[in-house]
Amino acid sequence: MERPNNRKLMKLKSILFFLAALAVTSCGTARYYGGASAGSIGTMAAFRPCSYISYIDRSGKQQYDDSLSAVSAQLVAMASEDAALPVSEWLPLDEAGQQEVVSFMDALAGASPKLVGVMPVPSVLDSLLEEAGYRYGLILFADGMVRDTRNLVREAVKEAAIGVALAVLTGAVVVSVPDRCVSALRAVILDAEQNRIVYDHAVVREDEDPLDLQDTRRLVRKVMKDFVGRGLP
């Protein structure tokens, strides 16, 4: 699949799109259900997965990584095929299409279910579905972070020192362990005919690796199970 244009993606906020949106939930999950299910919509296309993975280097600097994002997107595609999702065709995305998906995910981050229900389908994606002869289209968008091991050790030592200092002052031992990685996945189903979102399920998991196939499989099953209505492989 084509890889996103690094320069254009770097113009967007270098953040995890879903973390802010899901921080207020206890389970790291956000859902919107507009009546769509595998049994009710019949034929559905899916866009080739997109991914936005950032890397925290040894010094603690975090930035978007094009190569890691490409690997993550490929893993989502593999996990989706393993799960036997009810998809008739996978539609490729050119640079404009990938940019549209990233911008759309940015707009969805933090949106309430009420707002998701009235948000229009992006014009580029709507046109791609209509040209391919499909009313419904699935977006799978991965988001996440991986941390350099040396930075992880340094941050862990720093947090431990802070914990010891607080224990001396308060008598309570509290040590915060930095995340080695964070993985998130969002599944959005578009209705090109009615120009609206009919399904949206996003999940964030700390210490699950966006570059690990087994972790990615778990996320795919999680975000799609309400739509499919059955256990996925």
Give, region by region, the residue ranges found by the protein language model.
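N-terminal segment of the mature soluble domain
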Residues: 58-146, 200-201
